[in-house]
């Protein structure tokens, strides 16, 4: 198995050999000693945002523990932003900038297990997004009353776009964060976690203070600035808060009614909402949406589907608001369970896209769920593997959404035991709650939980862009069948039916045959709605 895996990695490497990665990519995506030598414990961000100048000024207090003795660490801040000073124990530290990396020198070696805090002062005009959230950066807009309406989305681009941070998914602040943001009077800032209070600074600005108790991905730390109205709701064990533009209050009260049944569904299938200490918020934003932890960005214009369209093309997708359901699903898959490297972002996106189908099954039943998830197949591009290249800030194919979701549906039907499947999914979410994991961790878990070696299936769908082809032909009472377009060790069953009978086959690359009395093409069917494969009738 190890040799087969090396072959896969080699093939993946050959496919990506022409990809040009820069030093900037390696500095952001790589793990060198200047990063691994310390562990971030907490961020305390205190900034002022000037909407007119589109500028930020302030500091981030970064608390960390030294893991191995070091005299130099790496933090990150986009090179268009200014480092004003970095202070440790009242001393200004020397630093060097290399692209977006900031290498900080201490006057003495820091001992292992010692704890420290440095204050990183900075300022500047952060990058403006051309098309958020796909292109990272700030969005400065106005509401219908001419008031500022501001947001930020940086997934993939990097949180260091707007604040100094260890810009790696491998390290979340274990003790959470505080986010204090001063904005012009008459505006409100909504960030992650619980609202602690506001303070008029007597200079035309009011500071809004927020506190996060849980570990948090650096790219989900956020600011949302507008003339918001606060709508409060509650479940027995969870506060629900909605911050919406004043003009949309009535629409929001009606539209967000789907949040409670969504939460009930997700908690029954994935376990308790992971960040109940920090509450759950939907915050209206000037872009489509993003999974900001405990402050989910919402910009779907209070429409069903995806901006009023059904991405599945089946009609089922118009039953729910895509952004509310999908981005909330990320609270379990992406925010709670996080991938070590963005090359493994399928751990976020595949499971979250699958959560849409789970919600439909909770609300409308299995048949509509299958209709919806199979409708997603039309969006699969088969352009490149789902898993990207490690260590260079490189995501794999966008097929991680739909193909990844269809992979999970396939695994459900390979296991062919719904009670077992739902327990596996629930236990997966609970086992790796608030943990940072790799693809190997996921595969190993599902192998052990299912009692089946699913590795060849995962490899086929994650590491190649080839979809298995089930080739068959019927001659008299005989069915001839085999797999094509698969790796040599591919091993996956598929179900067929005829005359009200359902039979499980175990095809290989070599043609097999089976005698089935009363077999005829009219009653013959292949359950390709349960397995993401292509079907081809042979000659």
What annotation goes with each model-predicted range?
Residues 83-88, 454-455, 470, 474-528:
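Beta-strand-rich binding/interaction modules
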Residues 18, 210, 242-486:
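Hydrophobic alpha-helical and helix-loop surface patches within well-folded domains
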Residues 23-24, 119-227, 523-533:
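Extended, low-hydrophobicity, Ser/Thr/Pro/Gly-biased non-transmembrane segments
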Residues 19-57, 65, 84, 141-147, ...:
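N-terminal, polar/Ser/Thr-rich
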Residues 73, 78-141, 204, 513-519:
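A surface-exposed beta-strand-loop module
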Residues 59-80, 164-169, 176-184, 440, ...:
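Surface-exposed beta-strand/loop patches in extracellular or lumenal glycoproteins
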Residues 1-24:
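Bacterial Sec-dependent N-terminal signal peptides
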